[in-house]
Amino acid sequence: MRWISRPGWPGHLLALAAGALTPLALAPFDYWPLAILSIALLYLGLRGLPARAALWRGWWYGFGAFGAGTSWIYVSIHDYGAASVPLASFLMLGFTAGVAFFFALPAWLWARCLRRDNAPLGDALAFAALWLALELFRSWFLTGFPWLYAGYSQLQGPLAGLVPVGGVWLSSFVIALSAALLVNLPRLFPHGASLLLALVLLLGPWAAGLYLKGHAWTHSAGEPLKVVAIQGNIAQELKWDPTQVRAQLDLYRDLSLPQQDVDLIVWPETAVPILKDMASGYLGAMGQVAADKKAALITGVPVRERLADGNSRYFNGITVVGEGAGTYLKQKLVPFGEYVPLQDLLRGLIAFFDLPMSDFARGPADQALLKAKGYEIAPYICYEVVYPEFAAALAAQSQVLLTVSNDTWFGTSIGPLQHLQMAQMRALESGRWMIRATNNGVTGLIDPYGRIVKQIPQFQQGILRGEVIPMQGLTPYLQYRVWPLAGLAGVLLLWALLGRRLRPQERRLFG
């Protein structure tokens, strides 16, 4: 098995296969032990490699992970971006090759500056710290691509109890640490004290996760809210067709009018497919309908802001009418779907760079939460719910979470179910109920433990009725966020860096 840790194609191909295991640990497959196996194979494959070979080993791992785990991008480009099979394949491969460097560069850094082959315990801790730093970096760099985090595999796994303590980040850290420790255990057998400490570090977090699973960090803030969520199941090719606007508005109206004994009626992202100011009459009428029911209606709608120079800016928004108030403008935009980077160069080249409603502006950072029935509701539009820290900042101020989305872009791929899993993780992190309304699924109600209580399956038109309980109190993660864990990672990485520079007799103190 030494070939695994040597430069060359056999090791690279194993890294590719190990990376491809990543999505199998996540939704919709949920074989969570594969997350540990995947990372363990990468860690083993990096052992002893020179920096240049480690860079390519990490790149192949990333190519496997993103190639298999974000294959839904091909569906968006080909099926809905009107790109040919060769062009869609080329763009997909180009994207995958680029984001694979998220793993390549840390692998190079690991081999060049941090790896400590003669200190297996310290080496495992430093590797887990670097893995956490990588996931944090991915959530921020170039607006972020926080997809395929290892920690999502634990949504209902043994580590779920740790998620309210340190978020998905803590789960990822423990998985990476466990993977490295399992690889290094045979090397620790001759060293009793180090072996004992390694076993504590290996088993302790999993035991703590099981012990805390189901612990109530938050409590009720009032009576349950009766919720109706509408899933319109509008085909994407009809979504922005001007001749279909009236039919869509009538559909959501007709599905909502019969609803009685309700507090919140929720429609999906851009359920109103025309600008808010153009739909003022319709929204006013629906607001009166909701008020007559003593309810609030919350819907996605594009918003126009007229500027002093005569131009306009457009936003992806959510607005509340009836017994509620507020309009929220989306802050985290989807590249190419809602805005086009370098648009002066790319617009007009292919249809994928000219998708409908792909010229949105970013909403301001300090926006008030939505208000309905006397409660603060944290809004997330589509992609925003996948950002743990962004979501936590809003959740801490709220009693209920709300996410609206249109996952039609991803067809029958695994993308919508991955997206749902990340939304579930936000509920678990915050200890709050979440309402999720989507155009074509999965619409559902999620409890504070990340479990789906009710749902409408994908690709069906439907009406979901249920209750959510407004919650108050802060989980440790909402209170302290990722900073304690990031600080620990920084200390461990500094420890590893210093350990590489010490003389052999001093290095034992760091091992």
Curated annotation (Swiss-Prot):
One GO CC annotation: plasma membrane
The UniProt record lists the keyword S-adenosyl-L-methionine: no
Active site: E269, K330, C382
Membrane topology, from the record: Multi-pass membrane protein
Pathways per UniProt: Protein modification; lipoprotein biosynthesis (N-acyl transfer)
One Gene Ontology term from the biological process aspect of the record: lipoprotein biosynthetic process
Record key words, sorted: Acyltransferase, Cell inner membrane, Cell membrane, Membrane, Transferase, Transmembrane, Transmembrane helix
Transmembrane segments: 7-25, 58-78, 90-110, 125-145, 163-183, 192-212, 478-498
Enzyme Commission number, as recorded: 2.3.1.269
Annotated CN hydrolase domain residues: 230-470
InterPro entries: Apolipo_AcylTrfase, C-N_Hydrolase, C-N_Hydrolase_sf, LNT_N
GO molecular function, one term: N-acyltransferase activity
SS bonds (residue pairs): none
Gene3D superfamilies found in the cross-reference section: Carbon-nitrogen hydrolase
Enzyme class, broadest EC rank: transferase
Subcellular location: Cell inner membrane
Keyword Amino-acid biosynthesis: no
Signal sequence bounds: none
Pfam families named among the record's database cross-references: CN_hydrolase (PF00795), LNT_N (PF20154)
Function: Catalyzes the phospholipid dependent N-acylation of the N-terminal cysteine of apolipoprotein, the last step in lipoprotein maturation.
Similarity remark: Belongs to the CN hydrolase family. Apolipoprotein N-acyltransferase subfamily.
Protein name in UniProt: Apolipoprotein N-acyltransferase
Source organism of the structure: Pseudomonas paraeruginosa (strain DSM 24068 / PA7) (Pseudomonas aeruginosa (strain PA7))
Gene: lnt
